[in-house]
Amino acid sequence: MKLLISFILRKVPRKYIQRVDEPILGLIGFFLRGNTYTCPIINKSYRKFLPYGRVKPRPNALCPGSLSLERHRLLWLFLKKKTDFFDKQLKFLHIAPEQCFMKPFEKQHGDEYLPADLESPLAKV
């Protein structure tokens, strides 16, 4: 299984992977439900997160529900606790948007949020 995933990640362009990774990982997340790890982005708990990394995968790095990594969850907590980012509706352009932030930012800021990327099929521009 690891060899298959590694092969897909090396050979299939990222823009195609982004179209199918959310439903597939969501299904995997259903089977990983538990109370050990909580993702602050979606407020869901899992008994474990998925490993992530090519050379030496980090255990419990990828949240199957939000597709966030450690750095994304840390940034989310910083924005939530140390800034007023979620207290008001802001107008901003998000260059190379992280997939885990797109839905929450869209919900919070509505039409004022504009994700932009050269290759991502998820970005608006």
Kindly give the residue locations of the regions a language model identified:
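Conserved N-terminal segment of class I S-adenosyl-L-methionine
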Residues: 2-125
